[in-house]
């Protein structure tokens, strides 16, 4: 930098217009950089000196120059909120769509200034209304979040697309309802926003509003602007639930008063076969239950719930049979709660008394060998022959160390109460169920049995009660919770739990397909102890240390529904198994090889050894 260039920079910094003009007339470059590699015009913009900015531009200063960080100089003008400087830059061909690498568009910066005049200055020069920010989201979405109605209207009037979808698959109308601002929602609808559009979970904005107990005025606005009201009421989310189902779950009597008459039937069902009356009765919304019954009388139809097992359900196709391990002499609280949760589902619950699987002599002597195990497996195969899923619920006993050791597991417990028959019978059932490709669920003790059978490790823990569970984001469990708990942080949930033992190391590590262990951890507690696992291939295996079958009295509607949906999702897996089995199709689900599980593992290991030259 020569002396004259230093003088020009100094004159600009000191707001000395005459000196700036003199030096420019002498031929000093108006695009020189200061010692920080910033264009000299940037100092004039920051000083809000319109005259010096104008002189520099007249003498060839670059209106699209950027500083050392790649930030356009017009960004500084936006920060000063000097409309006159912004206009002079735009008039001198500053690019209204300038977006340097890894930077946001200039229009987004204008929107974030919250100044309508500045936004209009860029719009009048052809700024791209539907551009994306550096994260891939529409800049119009940021305008909606700002809740500046004047700016939103200006963008819409210039042609911003009210039906843009963000990279998460949600139309902008979903962002608008989050603001709870009726005027913004109305503005989008008036400019053509589709009130019937769905997000990636299959929910319309009406569904989402109901799940969040949304503002009735906003809901009414959306409905009144629907082209086909009957159609929008009968749209279903991915769980098969309609607007009426969600209203019944939320207990929103105002919605029922206003819109129930739009439904030609009150017996519309979701994927699990539930009607709105099922949910209103289950959750204690008596007023809504009465409204549904009154509406059914007006329609001269009988209103049904799945709980009552009426002829309405008897006429539906065959339903899956779910085997539940139990002891007919000792029915524990958690075991009964599991059976009751399943009975609310679209399935038949069939008890299997595990004591009938183990030979009496073996149980009396607490003796185990291959002959006894094979006899238990033969009995288990008989009991599970026509079943479509297996559930091993919680109980008051621990996994027997001798049984676990025989199957390759490890149990480090000393003074616990062991149940030899239960441990052997349930591991025999597990072997049969896994070979058949049958869906499996284990709760509390069942969680430990499954992991011990799959060569996991069980340890003792001081009597532990917990509520807070951390869910792994890439798990099926997270997916289920996400669909049904939109108002909560899905990765932090409250569940009831009480146990003396824990899974120290998960099982399934010796069973590999495509280099994946059979099981993965899907939830932990605040002590980082394993709270849930699920299978990564083959038929679904889901285990829970906590108790989704036990609802606390403090649970919200959303938490009650969440627990029901965990069971509903499992029953849907059983239904898939039932259909594949009845069609003679491969029942290994994700594993397209019609071989036993053991054969598949051995084949995989043989392939790996061949590749290594062993």
From Swiss-Prot:
The disulfide bridges present are none
Lineage of the organism: Bacteria, Pseudomonadati, Pseudomonadota, Alphaproteobacteria, Rickettsiales
Keyword Repeat assigned to the entry: answer is yes
Q: Which UniProt keywords apply?
A: ANK repeat, Glutamine amidotransferase, Repeat
Q: Source species, please?
A: Rickettsia bellii (strain RML369-C)
Q: Where are the ANK repeats?
A: 3-32, 36-65, 69-98, 102-131, 135-164, 168-197, 201-231, 239-268, 272-301
Domain Glutamine amidotransferase type-1: where? 348-580
GO: which molecular function terms?
hydrolase activity
Protein name per UniProt: Putative ankyrin repeat protein RBE_0997
The catalytic site is made up of: 444 (nucleophile), 547, 549
- For the keyword rRNA-binding, the answer is no
Q: Which residue positions does the secretion signal occupy?
A: none
What SMART domains does the record point to? ANK
Domain of life according to the entry:
Bacteria
Cross-referenced Pfam families: Ank, Ank_2, Peptidase_C26
């Amino acid at each position: 930098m020569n002396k004259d260039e230093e003088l020009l920079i100094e004159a600009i910094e000191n707001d000395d217009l005459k000196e700036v003009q003199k030096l420019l007339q002498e031929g000093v470059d108006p695009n020189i950089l200061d010692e920080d590699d910033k264009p000299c015009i940037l100092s004039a913009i920051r000083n809000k000196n319109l005259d010096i900015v104008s002189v520099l531009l007249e003498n060839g200063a670059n209106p699209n120059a950027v500083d050392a960080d790649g930030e356009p100089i017009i960004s500084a003008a936006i920060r000063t909120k000097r409309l006159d400087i912004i206009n002079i830059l735009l008039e001198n061909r500053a690019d209204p769509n300038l977006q340097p690498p890894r930077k946001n568009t200039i229009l987004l910066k204008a929107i974030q200034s919250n100044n309508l005049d500045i936004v209009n200055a860029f719009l009048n020069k052809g700024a791209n209304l539907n551009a994306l920010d550096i994260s891939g989201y529409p800049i119009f979405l940021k305008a909606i979040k700002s809740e500046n109605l004047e700016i939103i209207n200006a963008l819409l009037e210039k042609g911003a697309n009210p039906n843009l979808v963000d990279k998460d698959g949600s139309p902008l109308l979903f962002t608008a309802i989050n603001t709870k601002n009726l005027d913004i929602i109305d503005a989008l609808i008036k400019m053509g926003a589709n009130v019937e559009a769905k997000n990636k979970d299959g929910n319309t904005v009406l569904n989402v509003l109901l799940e969040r107990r949304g503002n009735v005025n906003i809901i009414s606005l959306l409905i009144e602007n629907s082209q086909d009201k009957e159609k929008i009421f009968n749209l279903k989310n991915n769980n098969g639930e309609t607007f009426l189902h969600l209203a019944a779950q939320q207990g929103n009597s105002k919605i029922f008063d206003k819109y129930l008459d739009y439904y030609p039937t009150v017996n519309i069902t979701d994927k699990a076969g539930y009607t709105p009356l099922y949910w209103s009765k289950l959750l204690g919304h008596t007023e809504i239950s009465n409204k549904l019954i009154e509406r059914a009388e007006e329609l001269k139809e009988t209103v049904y719930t799945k709980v009552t097992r009426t002829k309405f359900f008897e006429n539906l196709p065959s339903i899956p049979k779910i085997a539940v391990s139990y002891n007919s002499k000792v029915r524990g609280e958690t075991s009964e709660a599991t059976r009751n949760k399943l009975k609310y589902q679209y399935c038949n619950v069939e008890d299997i008394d595990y004591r009938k699987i183990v030979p009496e002599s073996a149980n009396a002597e607490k003796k185990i060998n291959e002959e006894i195990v094979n006899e238990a497996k033969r009995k288990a195969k008989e009991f599970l022959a026509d079943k479509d899923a297996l559930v091993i619920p919680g109980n008051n006993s621990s996994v027997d160390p001798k049984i676990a050791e025989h199957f390759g597991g490890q149990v480090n417990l000393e003074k616990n109460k062991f149940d030899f028959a239960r441990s052997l019978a349930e591991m025999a059932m597990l072997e049969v169920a896994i070979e058949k490709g049958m869906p499996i669920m284990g709760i509390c003790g069942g969680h430990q049995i499954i992991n011990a059978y799959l060569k996991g490790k069980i340890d003792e823990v001081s009597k532990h009660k917990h509520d807070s569970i951390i869910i792994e984001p890439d798990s099926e469990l997270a997916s289920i919770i996400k669909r049904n708990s939109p108002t909560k942080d899905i990765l932090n949930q409250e569940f009831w739990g009480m146990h003396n033992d824990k899974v120290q190391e998960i099982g399934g590590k010796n069973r590999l397909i495509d280099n994946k262990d059979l099981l993965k951890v899907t939830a932990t507690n605040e002590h980082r102890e394993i709270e849930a696992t699920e299978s990564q291939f083959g038929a679904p295996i889901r285990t829970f240390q906590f108790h989704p079958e036990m609802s606390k009295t403090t649970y919200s509607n959303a938490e009650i529904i969440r627990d029901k949906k965990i069971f509903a999702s499992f029953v849907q897996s059983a239904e898939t198994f039932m259909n594949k089995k009845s069609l003679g199709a491969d029942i290994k689900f994700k594993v397209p090889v019609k071989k036993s599980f053991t054969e598949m593992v051995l084949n995989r290991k043989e392939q790996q050894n061949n590749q290594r030259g062993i």
